[in-house]
Amino acid sequence: LLNITYKKFSDNRGKSDLISQWERCLDMIQNEEYFILFSDDDIMEANCVEMFYQALACNHIYDVYHYNIDIIDQHENITKHCNEYPQILSASEFIRLIYTYQIDARMPEFIFRTSHFNETGRFIKFDLAYRSDNATVLVCAEEKGIFSIEKAKVLWRDSGVNISSTYNISTQKRKAIATIDFFNWLEAYYTSKNQTSPLTLKERLLLTITEIS
């Protein structure tokens, strides 16, 4: 039997501050060694949990695990078959591949070791939580990389109302500023480690311009 706790919050905090909503969900964790922030409109394939435990039995050293994803629409039709990750992917290569459009990433496809997540400072916050998932995965996976679980996928729903799918002028402006903040944070992060950012200044500028346009 599964020990499941349902929690109804008195306010819709995620509407105004998604990171704050994630934080209070994380605060509910008790003795769980791992967690996944899974959305109520996305879908796990039936064998996802089974394949995670199989992966864990043989590859228990990692702090970040990952499911490959496909994108679905509101009718559960697959609209995009996303490229699969290498089974072991370094944190820097993760960033490089995302921002050169070779892989996709969404928060519900990642499983984190709870103790390590807390030790690394939890979520990296940007406006609208935009780019926060990428930054958070980078920090958590810096030491050991990301281990991808085979033979099971997460189906991430692009409903047309997700932040990443919203195109009104106000939201686009906030997303552009969040992207600039993220790239500034990224440069500072690698500078603090005496390492070179996986994205050049030219690449970061082009990506920012793309976000604005």
Please place each PLM-identified region on the residue numbering.
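Acidic donor-binding segment of Leloir-type glycosyltransferases
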Residues: 1-11
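Glycine-rich, basic loop-to-helix element that forms the pyrophosphate-binding segment
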Residues: 10-30
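Short beta-strand-to-loop acidic/aromatic patch adjacent to the donor-nucleotide binding site
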Residues: 32-41
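Acidic metal-phosphate-binding loop of nucleotide-sugar-dependent transferases
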Residues: 41-43, 69
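Conserved donor NDP-sugar-binding/catalytic core segment of glycosyltransferases
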Residues: 49-80
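Conserved nucleotide-sugar donor-binding catalytic segment
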Residues: 67, 88-170
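Acceptor/aglycone-binding surface of glycosyltransferases and processive sugar-polymer synthases
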Residues: 73-89, 100
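Non-catalytic, C-terminal membrane-associated alpha-helical segments of glycosyltransferases
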Residues: 171-174, 199-213
